[in-house]
């Protein structure tokens, strides 16, 4: 039984007398259609021809729609056409609704209570209304807290500046003799503290218990305010009515940063308070108290492991 080789099929050589074993004659490969022999080559050629025709059509379309910019009218026509195309592509942007400021809605006079509340909440339009109507910037409540006190506590620096320009007293005292500097240190607002001190506020003011802003900055754990007070001339070893210095307070509250700053700037370790205790002894007593509490806890039968 004879078979046609691959080479014969590809080359198209004539084969004579090739008959299958089943009695069916096999036609001469040389007589087969030429499309069958050259099928892959012609398919590639047809694909290339098709791509060339598509490129040619695209080029013709481009040339037919191209503008010849021979004069200014042609250029204007091109610009108008581009604008028209852009309008179709990008929808027009909706205008944003106008929001009327609340200041215009407030027409009634602003009372003292509303004025102080506005200072705490930073509602400047109410402050402006109050001051425009001739209100006193130093007006206060029953505890002698002014708008400047509240603005300093809450950290509204622009409002602080506005009140100072309007004539607010920079060293106004509340019922505990605390000035706005105390309130700024209590809130930890360094920017406002700088504003007040630049306006001549007293850095070593004292309240009714003899504390200074330095004591307050230590108690409220605001080392940035503490350092600025020291740089502006705060007394490092100032004592309150209990005889405690800022270093005593730093030890008592366990504020490592405050202790480090005070010692770095030269705070004295040997100052005794009213109980004749120095900051060093206070630290030892504090450590001893912790140690005794831990030992008592461990010695308790219910807490043994």
Swiss-Prot record:
Coiled coil, from the record: 41-72
Alphabetically ordered keywords of this record: ANK repeat, Coiled coil, Nucleus, Repeat
Region (Interaction with TTN): 178-195
Basic residues composition bias: residue spans: 83-92
SUPFAM superfamilies attached to this UniProt entry: Ankyrin repeat
Highest rank taxon of the organism: Eukaryota
Range of residues in the leader sequence: none
Region (Disordered): 83-104
A GO cellular component entry from the record: nucleus
GO BP annotation list: fatty acid metabolic process; positive regulation of transcription by RNA polymerase II; regulation of sarcomere organization; response to muscle stretch
ANK repeats: 143-172, 176-205, 209-238, 242-271
GO molecular function, one term: transcription cis-regulatory region binding
Tissues expressing this chain: Mainly expressed in heart, skeletal muscle and brown adipose tissues.
Protein's cellular compartments: Nucleus
Pfam assignment, any one: Ank_2
Transmembrane feature ranges: none
Keyword hit for Cytoplasm: no
Assembly with partners or alone: Interacts with titin/TTN and MYPN.
Primary role: May be involved in the energy metabolism. Could be a molecular link between myofibrillar stretch-induced signaling pathways and muscle gene expression.
Descriptive protein name: Ankyrin repeat domain-containing protein 23
Species assigned in the record: Homo sapiens (Human)
């Amino acid at each position: 039984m004879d078979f046609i080789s691959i080479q014969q099929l590809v080359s198209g050589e004539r084969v004579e007398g090739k008959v299958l074993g089943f009695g069916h004659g096999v036609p001469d490969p040389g007589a087969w259609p030429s499309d069958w022999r050259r099928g892959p080559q012609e398919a590639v050629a047809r694909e290339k021809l098709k791509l060339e025709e598509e490129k040619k059509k695209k080029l013709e379309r481009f040339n037919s729609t191209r503008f010849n910019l021979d004069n200014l009218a042609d250029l204007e026509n091109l610009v108008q056409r581009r604008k028209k195309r852009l309008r179709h592509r990008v929808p027009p942007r909706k205008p944003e609704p106008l929001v009327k400021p609340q200041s215009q809605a407030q027409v009634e006079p602003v009372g003292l209570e509303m004025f102080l509340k506005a200072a705490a909440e930073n509602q400047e339009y109410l402050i402006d209304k109050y001051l425009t109507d001739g209100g006193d910037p130093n007006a206060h409540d029953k505890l002698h807290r002014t708008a400047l006190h509240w603005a300093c506590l809450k950290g509204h620096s622009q409002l602080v500046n506005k009140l100072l320009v309007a004539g607010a007293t920079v060293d106004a005292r509340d019922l505990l003799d605390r000035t706005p500097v105390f309130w700024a240190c209590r809130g930890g607002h360094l920017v406002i503290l700088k504003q007040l001190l630049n306006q001549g506020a007293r850095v070593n003011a004292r309240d009714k218990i003899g504390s200074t802003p330095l004591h307050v900055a230590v108690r409220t754990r605001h080392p940035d305010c503490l350092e600025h007070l020291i740089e502006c001339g705060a007394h490092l070893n100032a004592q309150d009515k209990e005889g405690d210095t800022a270093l005593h307070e730093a030890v008592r509250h366990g504020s490592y940063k405050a202790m480090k700053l005070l010692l770095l700037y030269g705070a004295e370790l040997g100052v005794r308070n009213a109980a004749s205790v120095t900051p060093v002894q206070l630290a030892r007593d504090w450590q001893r108290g912790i140690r005794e509490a831990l030992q008592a806890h461990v010695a308790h039968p219910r807490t043994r492991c």
